[in-house]
Amino acid sequence: MEGWQRAFVLHSRPWSETSLMLDVFTEESGRVRLVAKGARSKRSNLKGALQPFTPLLLRYSGRGEVKTLRSAEAVSLALPLSGITLYSGLYINELLSRVLEYETRFSELFFDYLNCIQALAGTTGSPEPALRRFELALLGHLGYGVNFTHCAGSGERVDDTMTYRYREEKGFFASVVIDNNTFTGRHLKALEEREFPDVDTLRAAKRFTRMALKPYLGGKPLKSRELFRQFMPKRTVKMKKD
């Protein structure tokens, strides 16, 4: 890919004494693995640019699975994430690294990612709504189509007051039993509209996306979730002291 394209670094690690191995998400080519030669050297002007959450323009070349970065420019400063929003950003980066195949184009998902990072950078409250919207968008781009508006059993529109059980690849069915796999009609409408006005609908959305993403993630836990769990007790203690 010789032309310039927009991209974000999802993850980087040292590769030899002076180079970096990058996992990047690009607008035109999707997820790509790149070697940034010399990026770790003291004289390199790339080191500061090749950071997560920094909007980039880059060019690369190569025919194998690992391409060679030819040039990269930061379009702007890194989007300002810190504390809980930083961990949230690391979570969506890891999510993309785990579920996307290399060199599969997801142009619309690229902008969903950008919108999510911008929402996280601009939030003064909980990052949860932005995360749930991104997870739902990701599932849609992966082909995980779910009808939130109609009961799969009867074909009727869901009722706010009724309970529905989710069956993978089949949809939601009316249920008289309430457990972790059931959702109210109100929850389903919130999922369809991507609007979560209260804690109850946010929790329901999180339950659903965890359930739906599990087949893509397998049994290996996400490292970012563990980091987030370690961060939350510290944050709670600090809030109590304040």
Swiss-Prot record:
The keyword Methyltransferase does not apply. The keyword DNA damage applies. One of its GO terms (biological process) is DNA recombination. Pfam families: RecO_C, RecO_N. Monomer. Involved in DNA repair and RecF pathway recombination. This is DNA repair protein RecO. It comes from Salmonella enteritidis PT4 (strain P125109). The lineage of its organism: Bacteria, Pseudomonadati, Pseudomonadota, Gammaproteobacteria, Enterobacterales.
